């Protein structure tokens, strides 16, 4: 399987602005998403190769191309929600294509993480911990649900 990470994923950053329009939090997590998939995918497939483009994958004659996309990122702060937790919610669009770039499967996965405010000393540490929990949630739900996606299951029977 070839894996393609587009620039939007590798350089992903979520910026939370204050009510006055000033940057309050900047969560640059693109590399964390890449590292997560780079850890999970080799456990799921015999061979995983990173490619710089869909076209490059086509030239390799791989069985499929996997290209994850972050569709949405939400951050919930105690000051805004009036709850004593920091929460991170991430919505992904998982795309699996043939080596020619044609659709095999396209499905949505969400991940969620939260951290109680009293467990950490700073907002930055709490947000980071909530994001780590959300990424762990993604790793487990992706690996456990992959073969449950009907189009993926159908594709796997052709290999």
Where are these regions (language model features)?
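Amphipathic alpha-helical segments that form well-ordered structural scaffolds
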Residues: 35-44, 137, 141
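Generic short beta-strand segments
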Residues: 6-10, 69-75, 110-112
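Surface-exposed short loop/turn segments
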Residues: 52-106
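Short beta-strand->alpha-helix linker/helix-N-cap micro-motif
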Residues: 38-60
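Short secondary-structure boundary motifs at beta->alpha junctions and helix caps
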Residues: 18, 22-29, 97-148
């Amino acid at each position: 399987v070839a894996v393609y990470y587009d620039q939007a994923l590798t350089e992903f950053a979520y910026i939370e602005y204050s009510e006055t329009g000033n940057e309050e939090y900047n969560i640059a997590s693109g590399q964390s998403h890449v590292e997560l998939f780079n850890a999970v995918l080799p456990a799921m497939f015999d061979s995983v190769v990173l490619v710089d483009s869909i076209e490059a994958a086509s030239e390799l004659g791989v069985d499929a191309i996997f290209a994850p996309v972050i569709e949405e990122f939400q951050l919930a702060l105690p000051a805004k929600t009036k709850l004593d937790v920091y929460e991170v919610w991430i919505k992904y669009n998982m795309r699996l294509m043939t080596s020619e770039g044609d659709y095999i499967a396209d499905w949505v996965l969400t991940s969620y993480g939260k951290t109680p405010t009293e467990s950490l000393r700073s907002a930055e540490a709490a947000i980071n911990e909530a994001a780590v929990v959300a990424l762990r949630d993604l790793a487990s739900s992706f690996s456990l649900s992959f073969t449950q996606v009907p189009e993926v299951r159908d594709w796997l029977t052709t290999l």
